[in-house]
């Protein structure tokens, strides 16, 4: 019995120690905060548009493989049966020689293998065109994926702004509760009316309603961000406020749109070479074997097999009629891309200039906000003390508390706007 008692006691102590350690173990593994960089990475890897990269790779491989097969010998089978108005004959007779009469119905079934020579240039450029088209398509996807960064920035910093407003609204509630305590004390000593406390309580209810609205707004933003990045997020997910990025200059523009313009010009360059290839003479080797009547001996009226081979030259000069205009059209398209690129760079630099001006303005506002908060806080503390002794009204205190709250909210929003603008600036540059 004594042994059982000791054993049970030890089990109880072990269970108690385990329960005491559980909170500690939990506290040692906090849920990591969500970072802006991870949101960018998830949005770009999990968005449906990202699947187009793999599809482009597949189409590129198929197109290049099909184009490369143009270098293989071209096999052809054909047959014909003809009824002619005349046939080969010798218009004189030879003594002692009986020449056969060639039938006017003739038949031929043959197979031919052709190995192109000059067309190998066209094959090479068709392979290059497949790769160039795929590179241009990847650049288009890059442009669409890059636009996701601005959307992620908007939601991420929107949530941070809501959090700051909720934090400051909670601080406002604390100030109002402190004011209610001072007002109730003053009313208890007969130096203030009880309506002063009621006015503060009404203001407190309004602040709490504002917090409830902000919480609903946050849930909406978090749900939208979760859809965009393809992750399950809880309503109370924490966001890691990023540090202000290092300054970059407008000369460092690395937008994917610029790569798209270059890849499109590369496609035009390949098409220009293909246009030249199409108007060259075509030289090929060929071998043909068949069975027919007559075969190669036109004076033999029997069905026989035959074979022949050689080199073939053909040149379709009809393409030269439109060659110059087609070449000019490609040149116009290339110049159009240059104009579009210049216009894009101009618009981008204008956006960068506006963003840099906005960031400088926000830095000045944040500096002045700090001084405004210091003065508003001093006035509020003085009004709180006066409220307790009945020398200030509840409305006065509410006015000063709200003024300080607006100043703190203004500074918090200006800081977030500065951070948001800095990351938008990097996104505009192509980071």
List PLM regions with ranges.
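Membrane-embedded beta-strand positions in outer-membrane beta-barrel channels/transporters
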Residues: 76, 110-112, 156, 308-312, ...
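Outer-membrane beta-barrel architecture
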Residues: 65, 112, 274, 312-314
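Small/polar (Gly/Ser/Thr/Ala-rich) solvent-exposed segments
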Residues: 51, 74-93, 100-103, 114-143, ...
């Amino acid at each position: 019995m004594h042994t059982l008692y000791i054993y049970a006691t030890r089990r109880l102590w072990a269970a108690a120690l385990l329960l005491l350690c559980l909170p500690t173990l939990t506290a040692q593994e906090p849920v990591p905060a969500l970072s802006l960089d991870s949101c960018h990475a998830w949005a770009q890897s999990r968005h449906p548009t990202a699947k187009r990269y793999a599809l482009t790779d597949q189409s590129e491989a198929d197109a290049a493989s099909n184009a490369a097969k143009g270098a293989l010998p071209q096999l052809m089978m054909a047959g014909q049966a003809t009824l002619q108005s005349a046939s080969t004959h010798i218009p004189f007779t030879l003594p002692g020689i009986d020449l056969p009469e060639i039938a006017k119905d003739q038949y031929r079934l043959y197979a031919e293998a052709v190995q192109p020579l000059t067309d190998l240039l066209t094959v090479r450029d068709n392979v290059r065109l497949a790769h160039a088209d795929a590179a241009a398509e990847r650049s288009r996807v890059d442009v669409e994926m890059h636009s996701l960064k601005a959307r992620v920035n908007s939601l991420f910093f929107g949530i941070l702004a809501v959090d700051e407003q909720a934090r400051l609204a909670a601080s406002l509630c604390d100030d109002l509760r402190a004011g209610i305590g001072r007002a109730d004390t003053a009313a208890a000593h007969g130096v203030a009316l009880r309506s002063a406390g009621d006015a503060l309580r009404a203001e407190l209810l309004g602040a709490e309603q504002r917090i409830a609205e902000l919480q609903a707004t946050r849930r909406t933003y978090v749900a939208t961000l979760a859809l965009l990045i393809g992750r399950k997020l809880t309503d109370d997910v924490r966001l890691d406020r990023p540090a202000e990025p290092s300054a970059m200059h407008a000369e460092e523009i690395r937008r994917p749109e610029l790569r798209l313009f270059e890849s499109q010009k590369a496609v035009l360059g390949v098409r220009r070479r293909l246009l030249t290839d199409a108007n060259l003479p075509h030289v090929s080797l060929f071998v043909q074997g068949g069975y027919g009547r007559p075969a190669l001996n036109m004076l033999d009226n029997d069905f026989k097999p035959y074979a022949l081979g050689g080199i073939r030259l053909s040149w379709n000069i009809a393409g030269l009629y439109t060659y110059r205009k087609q070449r000019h059209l490609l040149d116009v398209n290339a110049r159009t891309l240059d104009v579009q690129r210049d216009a894009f760079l101009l618009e981008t630099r204008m956006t960068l200039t506006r963003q840099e001006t906005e960031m400088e303005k926000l830095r000045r506002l944040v500096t002045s906000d700090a001084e405004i908060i210091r003065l508003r806080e001093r006035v509020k503390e003085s009004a709180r003390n006066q409220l307790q002794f009945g020398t200030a009204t509840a409305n006065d205190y509410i006015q000063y508390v709200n003024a300080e709250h607006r100043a703190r909210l203004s500074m918090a929003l200006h800081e977030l706007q500065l951070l948001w603008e800095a990351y938008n600036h990097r996104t505009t540059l192509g980071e």
